[in-house]
Amino acid sequence: MTKRTFGGTSRKRKRVSGFRVRMRNHTGRRVIRSRRKRGRARLAV
């Protein structure tokens, strides 16, 4: 069986797809809006 190779880095994840990064531009705000509309518990990472 193969190993799980994805480690995941908290800082990188926040910088790429955190809430404040999403709010910076129009498309990011659209993502937040659509997730709010859908009723997601977590809007961003």
From Swiss-Prot:
Database matches in Gene3D superfamilies: 1.10.287.3980
Aminoacyl-tRNA synthetase is among the record's keywords: no
PROSITE patterns listed in its UniProt record: RIBOSOMAL_L34
Gene Ontology cellular component terms for the protein in this record: ribonucleoprotein complex; ribosome
Gene Ontology MF terms: structural constituent of ribosome
Pfam name, any one: Ribosomal_L34
Swiss-Prot/TrEMBL GO biological process terms: translation
Swiss-Prot/TrEMBL keywords: Ribonucleoprotein, Ribosomal protein
Keyword Glycosyltransferase annotated: no
Family according to the record: Belongs to the bacterial ribosomal protein bL34 family.
Protein name: Large ribosomal subunit protein bL34
Taxonomic source organism: Prochlorococcus marinus (strain MIT 9313)
